[in-house]
Structures are given as structure tokens and as C-alpha cells.
């Protein structure tokens, strides 16, 4: 467990704590988008979103809306889970599903939406700091769909500083290395002020207690998920072992089945924990079809 003082803004806890301050949220959005942003409400951190109880929920890092009714979902991602483009699509879909009131027929009343993901790796391999995606026509790229949806992927390791603002480059470096030395090396006055506010967060006893509680809760949830996963793995392994044993010998089949079951389930649990999908970890022990669906999602055999 890292000390609170050693966290950077790529750590979800510190990012959420920092973005609860509307000035931090506003500064980050303005630097990324290169335009003025006036927030209508206080940012909401770790906002749960679910289309219906039958489907999995998503927890967006920071949700905000401006006075033009534009919605912003801003996420940080420390590791490449190989599914971020489709995850951004999923987040956009569940946000869209809640934008219109029941019975509303005018789809033009849907808010514009920005899905912004900040990561310390280059998702697309083009060495850019920023990748912005909007719908255009494949046959004629000059034709824009203008559906109001924008997805932005930011790479803290970009190599094209001439194509973005110097302040954005400084912000991305600061997000990855949230230290006084890094802030001192920035020319941006907004980053200097942000660093002062984040220093206050890191020195807050109240925030320190919340951080410890969050860590303890996550450790307990992970342990419970592992236990459930191991139980499911044993059951699945025994079943596979019995089936295989009919053809290859019961003893050998059961042993191999148990080993393969535990191995596959362990890999699935590791993948889910990497994405903090604790609820999915709990569900796989009770829902074999859902478990198989996740195995296919992550390409686990």
C-alpha cells in the first residue's frame, strides 16, 4: 500500500479526491479541451451507473456537467487492460441511457458527452499526447455525424508537443508525477495552484482516514472475491476432470480438470481485479453463464 503522500493523479483515490474540488475539475477540463468550462454542479466522483439491475454497473471516476449542459466523464487508467476503447463505448452508452427522461421523444435534447481517459501508455502507438474520436463518414471523412459524442484518450508519454498546447503537456506529466518538483518545473499557473490544493489533500487527516478505510475495504473485497473464485474454480475443475476422466482415466482427468479450472478462474479473477470489477468477481461464483461470458470477453480458455 502506497502512502497517501506518494500517490499521483493516476491513482483513482487521489484523482477522485482532487476532482471533487470544482476548480481542479474545471482546470483539468479547460486545459484538455482548450476552451472555457463553467461547471453547473459540483463534480460527482465514483458515480455508479447502471442501465438496469439485470446488467453490470460501471463506476465512473468523475462525472461533471457544465452550464451548456455538456456532460463530462473523466477517467484515469494506470494499466492497459486491452479493452479501453470498448469500455469507453460502454461508459458512453450507459451515460446516454440516462440523459433523456422517460417518455421524451426528442433525441435532439440529448446532452453532448465527452468521455476522457488519461493513461501512462500509448493506446494506439502513434506517439501522440491526445487522440480525439468523433463519428465521421467512412466514405467521405469530411461528413461528420454530429451526434454530440466525443471520446478523448490522453497519453502521458506522447512525443508530439508541437501539436498540443504546452500546458497540456505539463498537465499530463504532472498527472503521472504529482510532486512538488514536477509542479515547480511547470510554467502553468493553474498547475501551481492545483499542486497547493493537492498538498492540502495529502496532508489532511480526514482524507488519510478515508484512504485507509478504502484500502481495507478493497482488500476485504478482493479476498472475498478470490475465495468465491477458488470455490467456483474447484467446482468447474472437478466437472471438467470427471468429463475428461471418462476418456483418459478418472484420476488423471480430475487432476487436470482441477488444475485447469483453478488456472482459468485465477486468471479471470486477476483480470477483474485489475479493473476493480469486484461485483463481477462475486457474481461469477454463482452464475456459470456469466462466468463463461467473461472468459470469452478476456480471451481465457
Model-derived segments and spans:
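Elongated, amphipathic alpha-helical interaction scaffolds
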Residues: 1-301
Amino acid at each position: 500500500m502506497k502512502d497517501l503522500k506518494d500517490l499521483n493523479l493516476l491513482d483513482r483515490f487521489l484523482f477522485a479526491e482532487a476532482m471533487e474540488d470544482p476548480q481542479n475539475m474545471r482546470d483539468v477540463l479547460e486545459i484538455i479541451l482548450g476552451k472555457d468550462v463553467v461547471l453547473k454542479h459540483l463534480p460527482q466522483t465514483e458515480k455508479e451507473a447502471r442501465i438496469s439491475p439485470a446488467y453490470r454497473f460501471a463506476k465512473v471516476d468523475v462525472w461533471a456537467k457544465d452550464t451548456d449542459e455538456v456532460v463530462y466523464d473523466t477517467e484515469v487508467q494506470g494499466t492497459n487492460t486491452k479493452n479501453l476503447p470498448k469500455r469507453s463505448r460502454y461508459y458512453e452508452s450507459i451515460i446516454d441511457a440516462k440523459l433523456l427522461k422517460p417518455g421524451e421523444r426528442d433525441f435532439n435534447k440529448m446532452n453532448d458527452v465527452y468521455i476522457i481517459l488519461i493513461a501512462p501508455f500509448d493506446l494506439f502507438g502513434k506517439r501522440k499526447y491526445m487522440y480525439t474520436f468523433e463519428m465521421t463518414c467512412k466514405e467521405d471523412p469530411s461528413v461528420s455525424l454530429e451526434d454530440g459524442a466525443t471520446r478523448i484518450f490522453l497519453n502521458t508519454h506522447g512525443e508530439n508537443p508541437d501539436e498540443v498546447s504546452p500546458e497540456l503537456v505539463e498537465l499530463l506529466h504532472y498527472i503521472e508525477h504529482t510532486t512538488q518538483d514536477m509542479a515547480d518545473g511547470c510554467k502553468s499557473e493553474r498547475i501551481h495552484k492545483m499542486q497547493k490544493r493537492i498538498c492540502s489533500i495529502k496532508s489532511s487527516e480526514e482524507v488519510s482516514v478515508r484512504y485507509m478505510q478504502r484500502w481495507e475495504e478493497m482488500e476485504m473485497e478482493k479476498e472475498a472475491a478470490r475465495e468465491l473464485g477458488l470455490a467456483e474454480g474447484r467446482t468447474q475443475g472437478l466437472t471438467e476432470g470427471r468429463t475428461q476422466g471418462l476418456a483418459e482415466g478418472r484420476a488423471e482427468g480430475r487432476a487436470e480438470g482441477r488444475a485447469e479450472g483453478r488456472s482459468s478462474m485465477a486468471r479471470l479473477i486477476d483480470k477483474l481485479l485489475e479493473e476493480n470489477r469486484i461485483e463481477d468477481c462475486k457474481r461469477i461464483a454463482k452464475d456459470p453463464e456469466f462466468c463463461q461470458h467473461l472468459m470469452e470477453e478476456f480471451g481465457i480458455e
